[in-house]
Structure formats: structure tokens, C-alpha cells
A protein has these predicted regions:
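Bacterial N-terminal signal peptides that target proteins for export
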Residues: 1-8
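Short, charged/polar micro-motifs that form catalytic or ligand-binding hotspots
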Residues: 11
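C-terminal motif of bacterial Sec signal peptides marking the signal peptidase cleavage site
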Residues: 17-20
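Predominantly soluble domains enriched in secretory-pathway, periplasmic, or organellar proteins
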Residues: 22-333
Length: 333
């Protein structure tokens, strides 16, 4: 694998001190035109969650602490939307080529425990563990305008523009919601649904669940094709983030230190893209054709590794505490 050196860069900007690392440093004549944002959860209960920002030249900047458990983030137009789980709030920042506006706008979710989100036509649909629902936040009025009851501990959420699919991680169901009527249909997919991806017309689900005494972790995957459900239980194993994503003509799931292709019966191939300690892989996303791995040991190891489709490691970035979700912003001419 190719590996690149990473060094520290400290930048003071206005009243904030941003500390990061980079693989390259841009010249003063080049203008940055993109950002990859990283949600650094921080330590639970410490309110030290932050956002790392990686520019197109590989420079990394980190914001000040913004709350307790920075769970997920999305880009919509020139806005960065952030869900802060244990602070029960939404943060919204304006994005420019120079970064994000601080301190941003803050909206309380009234103790709901927000988790994951999708944005459709100016509305943020986000899951909530404590209230067991999907709330609808309007990006024009800045109001939460609806709440859709779903199953226990809703986690991952995806949309095709007309429907939502929600993984109810505290049980064995996925909720399918019509965006217009907000009506819900539940599909039984097996224990512990976590993350979802739509591939062609099918919805794939990664699952992670536990023994009654929480000492054994089990993994699996499911597929929803209309009303037909395929379920495959993989058995027990090490901790697994359970990412699932579409790549070319196939669907991949995080497994055994990388990403493994799933066959028609949802079995996982032994060959993987990426080769890391499985217990350190917290999240994986595909950005501009490459795979971005959030790597953490919940202590001093907090990195993002970027890997191409051949499994070659392209970049390593040092980021904030306990990195998870990613979001891409690109300047539109």
C-alpha cells in the first residue's frame, strides 16, 4: 500500500485556534474549492465533540468543541448541518471556500437524542433514539414541522426522493415512509438493523446485535425487494461499524478490516478493500470514487484513511477525537 507522511499544522483564524495535519500545503496563490467535513464525536459526557475540515490540498483544521457526541453531518447547498446527539441539538453553519461560519445557528431538539439524517427538498429528516421517531426540520423556516413515529432506537436513514427507509436498531424492523403522506410500512429484516443503502431498486441493510448479556457481538445483512426480504446472519465477531455502500455494480459491507463485496445471497467475499484492525473501523463512506475510513481506538488513534478501489492507501489525516461521519462540499461555479 502507498503511504504518505502527515505532519502538524497549527493555524490561528480570528478568535478560533484550529489545529490539524496535512499531507500537502497549498501555495498562497491557490484557492481551496472543496471541503470534507468529519464528525468527531468526542468523549461521551465531556462535551468535547468537534468538526475536522480537510481542504482539497490535504490541510486539516479542527473547530472548537461544539457539543456532546457530534453524531452526524450533511451538506445542503452551502450549509453544513450537524446533529449533536447527547446535547440534543442541530447546528447549522454557512460554508465558504475559507471554512465555516462560527458559532453557527443552534436549534434544540428537546431531548430527542438525534442520530442520522437525510436532506430532501430543503427538509432535514432525522432519526431520534429517545423519542423513537423521525423529525422533519424545515431549512427555510428553521422549525421542526413534523414527527413520524417509527420503531425502537431508529439509526440509519436513506431516501430516494419520494420515500424514506429507517433502520430501527433496537428491534428487527426497517420503516418505509412515504414522504408525501408520511405513512409508514414496516419490514422485518432481522435483529439490529443499523445502516442502509439503496442499490438499483433494492434496499440493503447492515445489522449488528448482541447477546442478552452484551458480551457477544453478532453481525448480518438483509435486503428488501418490494415485500420480499432476504436475511443472512454472519455469526459473532469483533466490533464492527457496519457500514454498507454501493460501488459500481455491487454492494459492499465493512468486514474483517476492510470492505467486502456481498454476493446475491448476501455472503461476504474474503477479499477486502482496505486492511485495518476491524475493531478500529468506526465508519466508511465513498467520496469521489475513493473510500474514506474513520479509524479510532477511542483513545489516541484518531485518523481518516483514504483508500482507492484497488486497496491502495492514498492519504492519512489526523483528526479529532473519535471520528465518524463524513460530508463533502464542493464549490459550484
Amino acid at each position: 500500500m502507498k503511504k504518505y507522511m502527515c505532519f502538524s499544522l497549527t493555524i490561528i483564524f480570528l478568535s478560533l485556534i484550529w489545529v490539524g495535519c496535512s499531507n500537502t500545503v497549498s501555495s498562497g496563490e491557490d484557492e481551496n474549492t472543496s471541503w470534507v467535513f468529519v464528525a468527531n464525536e468526542g468523549n461521551y459526557g465531556a462535551s468535547d465533540g468537534s468538526i475536522s475540515m480537510i481542504d482539497e490540498f490535504g490541510n486539516v483544521y479542527e473547530t472548537e468543541s461544539i457539543g456532546d457526541v457530534v453524531q452526524s453531518l450533511e451538506v445542503y447547498n452551502n450549509k453544513l448541518i450537524v446533529l449533536v446527539n447527547n446535547s440534543h441539538k442541530i447546528k447549522i453553519y454557512a460554508i465558504t471556500t475559507e471554512g465555516i461560519s462560527m458559532p453557527g445557528i443552534e436549534i434544540s431538539t428537546e431531548g430527542s437524542g438525534p442520530r442520522e439524517m437525510v436532506v430532501v427538498d430543503g427538509k432535514v429528516y432525522f432519526t431520534n433514539w429517545i423519542t423513537s421517531d423521525v423529525k422533519v426540520f424545515n431549512l427555510f423556516t428553521y422549525n421542526i414541522e413534523a414527527s413520524i413515529p417509527v420503531g425502537s432506537m431508529p439509526e440509519g436513514i436513506i431516501s430516494d426522493g419520494t420515500k424514506l427507509w429507517v433502520a430501527n436498531s433496537g428491534e428487527d424492523t426497517v420503516s418505509e415512509i412515504d414522504i408525501t403522506s408520511l405513512s409508514e410500512t414496516r419490514h422485518i429484516v432481522g435483529s439490529g438493523p443499523q445502516n442502509l443503502v439503496k442499490h438499483n431498486s433494492d434496499v440493503y441493510v447492515s445489522r449488528t446485535y448482541y447477546s442478552d448479556d452484551w458480551t457477544i457481538t453478532y453481525h448480518g445483512a438483509s435486503r428488501i425487494v418490494g415485500s420480499e426480504i432476504t436475511i443472512n446472519n454472519y455469526g459473532s465477531g469483533g466490533a464492527c461499524g457496519g457500514s454498507v455502500l454501493s460501488h459500481q455494480s455491487d454492494v459492499y459491507r465493512s468486514f474483517d478490516g476492510g470492505l467486502a463485496r456481498m454476493d446475491a445471497e448476501l455472503n461476504l467475499e474474503e477479499r477486502t478493500i482496505g486492511n485495518y484492525n476491524q475493531s478500529h473501523i468506526y465508519h466508511v463512506e465513498k467520496i469521489n470514487g475513493n473510500f474514506w475510513f474513520a479509524i479510532t481506538d477511542w483513545n489516541d488513534l484518531n485518523e481518516v484513511r483514504v483508500v482507492d478501489s484497488n486497496g491502495d492507501e492514498l492519504f492519512t489525516y489526523k483528526v479529532g477525537q473519535n471520528p465518524g461521519d463524513f460530508a463533502l462540499w464542493e464549490q459550484i461555479d
